[in-house]
Amino acid sequence: MKTVFFDIDTQIDFVYPAGALYVPGAERILPVIAELNRRAPLVISTMDAHSEDDPEFQLYPHHCVVGTTGQHKPACTLTDASRTGESRQIILEKQQLDCFSSPRLTPLLSELNADRYVVYGVVTEICVNYAAFGLLKTDKVVEIVTDVVKALDEKKAHEMFSRFIEAGGRLTTSATVLASL
């Protein structure tokens, strides 16, 4: 089964307490994200890439502005191309909450022709939600790794998990995913 991992928005502004839009506890999932990304056959890492005057800043504080430290991914979430000579990580920048707003994503998914998508990152009820439900539209197996996501609103996250299961998605754990590799 061809599997592609989706590392959603694990950027400095979200995952560290000093970040502009810190998700509480996100730094604690970084070691597992690092392990998943390291062992993934292929990982697509989405990244917010906002301009200084991005309309999203009417809803959320300034974060992940292009060229700032906060927009970068923590080094531990990047795969090491030097080991194999080729990268197994595709960075997909986006200016909106939904990664499917990137014109690169749909053609990329068609090209990759995966059977299974494994999703993790931040924020569970926002960008992870958009990615997971968008991937369900591909009629492939889509799994959210529940111990490797973090929410701003736990109630909304649990509601999202329920809707995701009802829509045909699966919930899994990092131990199960890692054991399957």
Write out the residue ranges for each language-model feature.
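Short, catalytically relevant binding-site loops at active-site mouths
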Residues: 50-52, 97-99, 125, 150-151
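Cofactor-binding loop segments of dinucleotide-utilizing enzymes, especially the Rossmann-like FAD-
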Residues: 8, 48, 122-124, 147
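A short glycine-rich beta-strand->turn/loop micro-motif centered on a GG-aromatic cluster
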Residues: 118-121, 141-154
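Short, well-ordered secondary-structure micro-motifs
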Residues: 56-57, 102-104, 130-131, 155-156
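Active-site acidic carboxylates
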Residues: 1-93, 141, 152-153, 157-181
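Internal catalytic-core helix/loop-beta-alpha segment
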Residues: 72-125
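Histidine-anchored nucleotide/phosphate-binding helix
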Residues: 32-36, 126-137
